């Protein structure tokens, strides 16, 4: 029903943001609400989920995120909350690359995704996803992610930093770069 909403971020919550558009406030569940800034004017690509007479808006900064979300919820056993959690923990290109390579182990790192769900995702989506923005090795960024977690950084901060890294560098250099960004 709603393809996108243009508006200003008014409130940021743990799992969602509130956007005001033409005097109407929309609560939109988003993978990484803390990546938004209060007062920021933007376009959020949305999906309206209807279940048991409850309307829930899910929103994404990029069309690619929304497209992957829609494909994930088409998989048996994966609902909007699980798909949102997957997108909150990994980038679109890393997830797509893992699915296309059949890497079930990588997919089980996402909250609520066990081996059975990971295999179902691969079965249903392998070969149907196009990896556009990320051509590097997703395993390198996965190692950086794990290293930052081990150093005590939280998931939200890590997810803000990973897209800023140059995946062509070595793992050690990427960790140094990530730490430099995080300490600014």
Question: What is the predicted function of each stretch?
Answer:
Residues 55-60, 80-99, 120-134:
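Amphipathic, charged-and-aliphatic alpha-helical interface segments
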Residues 63-67, 97, 101-103, 172:
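Long, contiguous secondary-structure blocks with strong helical propensity
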Residues 71-74, 83-86, 98, 106-109, ...:
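Residue-level recognition of specific faces of alpha-helices
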Residues 127-184:
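C-terminal extensions
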């Amino acid at each position: 029903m709603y393809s996108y909403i243009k508006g200003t971020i008014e409130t940021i919550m743990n799992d969602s943001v509130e956007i005001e558009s033409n005097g109407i406030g929309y609560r939109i569940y988003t993978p990484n609400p803390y990546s938004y800034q209060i007062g920021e004017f933007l376009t959020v690509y949305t999906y309206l989920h209807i279940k048991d007479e409850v309307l829930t808006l899910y929103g994404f900064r990029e069309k690619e995120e929304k497209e992957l979300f829609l494909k994930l919820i088409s998989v048996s056993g994966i609902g909007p909350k699980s798909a949102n959690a997957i997108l909150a923990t990994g980038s679109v290109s890393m997830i797509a690359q893992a699915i296309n390579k059949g890497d079930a182990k990588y997919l089980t790192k996402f909250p609520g995704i066990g081996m059975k769900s990971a295999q179902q995702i691969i079965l249903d989506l392998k070969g149907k996803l196009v990896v556009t923005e990320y051509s590097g090795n997703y395993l390198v960024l996965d190692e950086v992610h794990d290293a930052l977690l081990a150093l005590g950084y939280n998931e939200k901060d890590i997810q803000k930093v990973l897209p800023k890294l140059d995946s062509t560098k070595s793992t050690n250099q990427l960790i140094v770069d990530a730490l430099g960004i995080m300490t600014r």
